[in-house]
């Protein structure tokens, strides 16, 4: 590849040059219940720019993106609006792909949901269980991090801070009976009114991180020293999601998951963090309905360093 791209790894802080002619890239996709807000758009525009540069430099790039179509927020929203979670997911995926087309984002080679990846997920969980890497707690299956020493050796933040952030971002560090506060959930037992799959280790559905492990490893070619070249997403995924994904993939393959972790900044609105809880999300589709030029939206979101946060204003 001519003109290698140099990017900073989010964990090591080192600048790494991508010199290989073959690149694989996995970017975490949406949970299809509230798409597409500007935070989504900024993330996928960032990786669209990386994708386009690598293509123009002569690299053969394989790009995969997931759809988190099994997740608590999706089920909660479906109940709130009185619809089936599958219908809600389908509608939101359609809206998201339309928004990405308007913003001129090149589609990934693989765009795969959790539901259609369930056989692979179950196989990977069974493999970890057979290797003695898991334990059961009241019907739920956890990864035993004491069997993964590199987790604590390479932890990218102080242990107590990791526990706090883990709890804020979907983890359960204080659940009684866990061996380690940071042990991640691999499989949760089935609950009423939720989708469930029958397995040898109990009926239920997967945890968040193993979903991305399965989709990434099953849709991207192995690149040698690591399983993939680039793992990407918003900076809110740096920990725990991407770190946990890397540890679980390493437990399966015996080598590092990604050569390079890339995280882009967050989008705020009028001086505040943009979030669902604040109710201040700005949606691409509504901007387009109001007559905003999609190329102007693209330019505005790319007019910053990709790692920097951006404060959006509707003025």
Summary of predicted features, one role per range:
Residues 81, 99-105, 121-131:
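Active-site-adjacent, His/Asp/Glu-enriched structural segments that form or flank metal-binding
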Residues 12-104:
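N-terminal, positively charged nucleic-acid-binding surface of large information/translation enzymes
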Residues 1-33, 48, 120-315:
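Alpha-helical recognition segments enriched in aromatics with Gly/Pro capping
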Residues 67-71, 93-96, 106-121, 139-147:
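Short, glycine/charge-rich beta-strand/loop segments that flank catalytic centers
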Residues 78-85, 109-115, 234:
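The substrate-binding groove and active-site-proximal loops of carbohydrate-active enzymes
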Residues 91-106, 110, 218-227:
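CE4/NodB-like, metal-dependent polysaccharide N-deacetylase domain
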Residues 43, 89, 117, 205, ...:
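Charged, low-complexity surface patches
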Residues 62-64, 110-112, 262:
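General small-molecule cofactor/ligand-binding pocket signal
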């Amino acid at each position: 590849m001519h003109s290698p791209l140099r990017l900073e790894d989010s964990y090591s802080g080192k600048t790494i040059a991508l010199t290989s002619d073959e690149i694989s890239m996995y970017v975490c996709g949406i949970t299809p219940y509230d798409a597409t807000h500007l935070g989504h758009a900024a993330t996928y525009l960032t990786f669209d720019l990386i994708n386009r540069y690598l293509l123009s430099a002569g690299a053969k790039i394989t790009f995969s993106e997931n759809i988190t179509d099994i997740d608590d927020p999706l089920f909660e929203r479906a109940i709130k609006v009185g619809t089936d979670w599958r219908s809600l997911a389908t509608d939101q995926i359609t809206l998201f792909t339309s928004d990405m087309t308007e913003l001129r984002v090149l589609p990934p080679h693989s765009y795969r949901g959790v539901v259609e990846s369930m056989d692979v997920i179950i196989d990977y969980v069974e493999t970890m269980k057979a290797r003695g890497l898991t334990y059961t707690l009241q019907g739920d299956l956890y990864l035993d991090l004491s069997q993964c020493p590199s987790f604590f050796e390479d932890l990218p933040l102080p242990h107590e801070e990791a526990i706090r952030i883990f709890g804020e971002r979907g983890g359960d560090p204080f659940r009684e009976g866990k061996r380690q506060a940071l042990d991640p959930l691999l499989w949760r037992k089935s609950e009423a009114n939720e989708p469930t799959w029958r397995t040898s280790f109990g009926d239920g559905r997967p945890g968040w991180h193993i979903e991305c492990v399965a989709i990434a490893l099953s849709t991207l070619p192995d690149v040698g020293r690591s399983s993939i070249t680039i793992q990407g997403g918003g900076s809110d995924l740096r920990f725990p999601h991407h770190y946990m994904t890397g540890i679980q993939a390493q437990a399966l393959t015996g080598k590092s998951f990604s050569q390079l972790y890339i995280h882009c900044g967050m989008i705020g609105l009028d001086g505040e963090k943009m979030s669902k809880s604040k109710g201040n999300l700005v949606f691409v589709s509504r901007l387009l309905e109001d007559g905003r030029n999609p190329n102007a939206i693209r330019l505005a979101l790319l007019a910053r360093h990709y790692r920097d946060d951006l404060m959006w204003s509707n003025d």
